């Protein structure tokens, strides 16, 4: 009976798996056997931090700054709801990887026809390039703010981080996780310090986490709210998470998978809570520094930087802000490289050397950034940053819907299939995100 069940599960996939996801690091991080809970949890911690990076990349900063400066603390509830949706979707992605041994790209390639799989690959690559554009722009702006390096040269300098990525990959997957966690802590500490300097209204903050009807009734507020929701869940993160959870040496048995799912959920939920604190602190800082002082139209990251020192009365406020921005851009670079490799190998079964893969993605991101910077300067760069987030929003449903489909399929997931209530919630979220992105696309096109 057990053998028959295994055979049925195997038959749910059309083709045998060619190679494990990220084969060079798959099953490479040891998990101590018979260890106590917290020691095991520590061994499983790490992938969640890499995922959380996508929730605090430079692309998210613009929406949080705009929301805080224009509407005060009201949109904090939107950041909270976005985070809850993220926890749900990332838990599905990690479960898919742990149970099936396939990442989302491999599963999609097997399930769908070759032409449709190719379309999904193109869309996923566009999302990764869009993410990389946001990283390039964020790092270039930070270098400009900290050292006065012209934006166009800052964009070119970001190509050098390729060598950092390659060095860390060579050292081992745990090194990448440690660097990412260090940079995340840097960002959190920076914004913690900024918040202390800004003296926010704690009562207004508490009220901001309660959803208000005006978010829906005020068109301008609704648009920024949708922008926060649309830019929070990153499509490449779903591919990434379904792969990197497999770096752990958990037993590939039912009990081992169940334990891995539990620890992975704790890991990602903890890391996404840190991301929530960072995003909330960006909005709180913008509200305390700009909204309460009547500066309601802070157009971009550079404007926020310039206004922080005189508003907060501290000479280091802007510097700390720029350091956090640079850390955010570098963090996202590390995860973008891995996601690109996962997508190309999973959909096309093409295995490029990491240096070639990274150069290809970075060149495709740098070229538009250099052209826009040369032609339009800082204003053009901010427009490109917003455009990259629109591209990400458009692609999201093409990752979310297959993810919900696969994790709701008993033949693929066996006893780990989504429960009836989880299916209802997951499909509701998928439909909501699809509607949200259609609305955002329509609004963007009509406002051109």
Curated annotation (Swiss-Prot):
Keywords: Cell membrane, Ion transport, Membrane, Symport, Transmembrane, Transmembrane helix, Transport. GO terms for biological process: iron ion transmembrane transport. It comes from the Bacteria. It is a multi-pass membrane protein. It is found in: Cell membrane. The chain crosses the membrane at residues 41-61, 69-89, 117-137, 147-167, 176-196, 215-235, 270-290, 307-327, 363-383, 384-404, 424-444. One of its GO terms (molecular function) is manganese ion transmembrane transporter activity. GO terms for cellular component: plasma membrane. H(+)-stimulated, divalent metal cation uptake system. PANTHER family: NATURAL RESISTANCE-ASSOCIATED MACROPHAGE PROTEIN 2, SOLUTE CARRIER PROTEIN FAMILY 11 MEMBER. Belongs to the NRAMP family. HAMAP family: NRAMP. This is Divalent metal cation transporter MntH. It comes from Listeria innocua serovar 6a (strain ATCC BAA-680 / CLIP 11262). The gene is mntH.
